Regions:
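Charge-dense, helix-prone N-terminal extensions
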Residues: 1-174
Length: 174
C-alpha cells in the first residue's frame, strides 16, 4: 500500500498505533546503523533509505530522477515489510547481493526466529518477529560506497542471454 504522506513523520502519524510502534522500532534500528552517506525520506510511498544524488548523481538506473534506493520500510495491507535492496535476488552466484542474502539467511536461522522473505523484502506482523540486532547488522554491513560498487558491477555484468543493457542505456537509445 503506497502512502500519500510527503514526510516520514506524516507517514508514521497515519499508521495505527500498533503498526506505528513496530515501524518505529525497525526505523530506530536502521537509523542507528545507517551509513551517514544514505538519507531517509519518502520514496515510492514508503519510508526510504537511499543514496542521494549528491553522493551518486546517476540515481536509480530504473528511474535516474530517483535517488538510488537502499532500503524501504512499509506498512502493507496484511503485514509490514522491510525491503533490503542489497539482498535483491539472493541467487547462487557470487554477486554482492547473493552473498549478503546468504549471510542474512544463515544469521537469521541462528536467531531461532522465522524468516518470511521474498526477493528483497522481509515481511513481519510485529517488531517482535524480527531479530532487530540482526537487522541493524544487515544495514551496517553495507556502507553506501560498497553498495554503489555492487550496483555498478551488477549493471555492467551481462545476463546469461547476453542482453544486459541497463534501463539508462535503453532510455538513451529511444
Amino acid at each position: 500500500m503506497q502512502s500519500k504522506a510527503s514526510t516520514v513523520q506524516a507517514y508514521l502519524r497515519s499508521l495505527p498505533a500498533d503498526r506505528r510502534a513496530a515501524i518505529s522500532a525497525v526505523r530506530d534500528v536502521i537509523l542507528k546503523n545507517l551509513d551517514p552517506s544514505y538519507e531517509e525520506g519518502m520514496q515510492y510511498g514508503m519510508i526510504g533509505y537511499y543514496v542521494p544524488h549528491s553522493v551518486y548523481p546517476k540515481g536509480y538506473h530504473c528511474d535516474p530522477k530517483q535517488p538510488l534506493p537502499f532500503a524501504m520500510l512499509a506498512s502493507q495491507k496484511n503485514y509490514m515489510s522491510l525491503y533490503l535492496m542489497c539482498v535483491y535476488g539472493g541467487g547462487d552466484d557470487e554477486s554482492a547481493g547473493s552473498k549478503h542474502a546468504r549471510w542474512l539467511r544463515e544469521a537469521w536461522a541462528k536467531t531461532g526466529k522465522k524468516l518470511d522473505m521474498g526477493k528483497s523484502c522481509i515481511r513481519f506482523k510485529k517488531a517482535e518477529d524480527l531479530p532487530l540486532e540482526l537487522i541493524g547488522e544487515a544495514v551496517k554491513r553495507v556502507p553506501a560506497a560498497s553498495y554503489i560498487r555492487a550496483i555498478e558491477a551488477a549493471l555492467s555484468t551481462p545476463r546469461a542471454n547476453g542482453t544486459r543493457q541497463s534501463a539508462r542505456n535503453k532510455a538513451a537509445a529511444r
